[in-house]
Amino acid sequence: MKPTLVLVGRPNVGKSTLFNRLTKSRDAIVADMPGLTRDRHYGHGKLGKKPYLVVDTGGFEPLVKEGILHEMARQTEQAIAEADAIIFVVDGRSGLTPHDKEIANKLRRIDRPVFVAVNKAEGMNSGMVEAEFHELGLGEPNAISAAHGEGIRGLVEMALESFPEPEEDEWHSDSVRVAIVGRPNVGKSTLINTLLGEERVIAFDAPGTTRDSIEIDFERGGRKYVLVDTAGMRKRGKVFESIEKFSVVKTLQSIEDANVVILMVDAQADVSDQDAHIADFILQSGRALVVAVNKWDGLDAYTREQTRQILQRKLKFLDFAKFHFISARDNIGLGNMFRSVDSAYAAAMAKMTTPRLTRVLIDAVAKQAPAKHGLFRPKPRYAHQGGSNPPIIVVHGNAVDQVTDSYRRYLEHTFREAFKLQGTPLRIQFVTAKNPFADKDKK
């Protein structure tokens, strides 16, 4: 399982800049998706062979007792408690503040490794910048510059030092792992209870991680599934009750561990930033996806149409996924939803032969050639599969690294149609043929 690094600190110390620096390796994958939210709070990173997750908690005000700042502090404290390591960001130019000391008092009581990152240290003597932050009592401070990338690698190496490299093959189960994620009170527990009651299975708690994600084995239509739940469910007889609280870390880890994610959205509430952030993370993770719009039965015809339009506008970057309008309580639409889970899983694991991929590519180019880039027109020549879960298609040719974003989307749409890849993100990588005369020209 990927370790989770949580960034904490008072407002305006550069946490977001550090977050962008730590997650830059994945930004390019989703940068050309229209409508994608850029205000990320959760992301992926990788140092060598060690992948990790990053959570940016926003400004931490631990002493505020009410209002939105109190709610932010509560969420931050929960993320801290569930983190694998904490990076405490302070401002080297402002120096040590009473606010920093308040946060340090909180962090000293947490049984997690804490690494103090003294940001904005560019052009300054690192020893002098670090000196006053020893007073925090959280170990050796580390001078960095998030804006310039200075000291970042060493900081992350220390944070990840105690975590092993991941196993080569993490997918060892015959069961399809389905994560059900969404905001509190959206109906995750109701959905699981309805599914379990429908199948008349005896469910059990299986705390599989230090964060006690709950895994529920069940069978449907002769196929085995594992439901990964983040709602804090506990067994009561043959049904479950839930006190739903939103846990960032549990949600991110359950997405990472899943084959397919069901993102639940409340039809009777507006699509929130939290919904969009989680949808963005699912896309970054490359997980197959089904969107379940719950409590649909409580809307009249006019409100349903308005809700559809809002969903299309706010979640348009999820156009590869099937949307299902359901009632988890009344078991309306769940059969079709689970058929989409199966088809999304099949799409994510699809095997595509090189000859057929190449035929589809050549036909697509014949119908619509790439636009010229300067004096040259990119010439895609053949394609092969580079991976699955999500499917990766590698396109080779001359100057193909110069194709436009719109042409990339055209090819993605073409491959999706040809191979029935609905329900899964699709990555297309372009590899430009090396000019055999390039080295000779230099001699």
From Swiss-Prot:
Binding site for GTP 2: 182-189, 229-233, 294-297
Pfam family, one: KH_dom-like
UniProt keyword annotations, A-Z: GTP-binding, Nucleotide-binding, Repeat, Ribosome biogenesis
Domain KH-like intervals: 350-434
Domain of life: Bacteria
Calcium listed as a keyword: no
InterPro entries with a match to the protein in the record: G_ENGA, GTP-bd, GTPase_Der, KH_dom-like, KH_dom-like_a/b, P-loop_NTPase, Small_GTP-bd
Domain EngA-type G: start-end pairs: 3-167, 176-349
A Gene Ontology BP annotation from the UniProt entry: ribosome biogenesis
Residues noted as binding GTP 1 in the record, renumbered to the chain: 9-16, 56-60, 119-122
GO molecular function, one term: GTP binding
Family: Belongs to the TRAFAC class TrmE-Era-EngA-EngB-Septin-like GTPase superfamily. EngA (Der) GTPase family.
Quaternary structure, from the entry: Associates with the 50S ribosomal subunit.
Role summary: GTPase that plays an essential role in the late steps of ribosome biogenesis.
Name of protein: GTPase Der
Organism: Dechloromonas aromatica (strain RCB)
Lineage: Bacteria, Pseudomonadati, Pseudomonadota, Betaproteobacteria, Rhodocyclales
